[in-house]
């Protein structure tokens, strides 16, 4: 379902859910929205919040120092390079006058990182990068698989970069409609 979304307010609300948890661990929680990102969008805030909440919870869980940051920018690649987006998504069912922005959300941390050998299974159910992390950090191993399903349902793509001991960056890009300009009453 497409719902009007004020991006800065939405981001602030999501981060507020994790402020206390980050503070208890001595982590700085930071966000930045690039200037060229439209702030009045239409999308599925429930699914967006579920994905961001899982990524932020993981970033805080697996970090003992530093900063957890949420960055929002536009995917500037030309359309032919965005082939990972499904050909049928809610964005394509709208009228030709609807403007779509490919908005990329990135969650970065200074946590334990992920070994390259674990990437192939990272978004599969019941998988954590290392069995010992399940014992130390807990969790079901379902979070990233659910994130992938939700991002897929929104017509997007999710991925990650990481290096053991150097933290991780999880990114997902989804097509979001720009809200139509509201008519101003004549003076």
For the regions a language model picked out, list residue spans one by one.
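Glycine-rich ATP-binding loops of the HATPase_c
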Residues: 132, 155-161
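Short alpha-helical segment within the cytosolic histidine kinase core of two-component systems
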Residues: 9-24
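Short alpha-helical Gxxx[C/S/T] motif in the catalytic ATP-binding
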Residues: 138, 143, 147
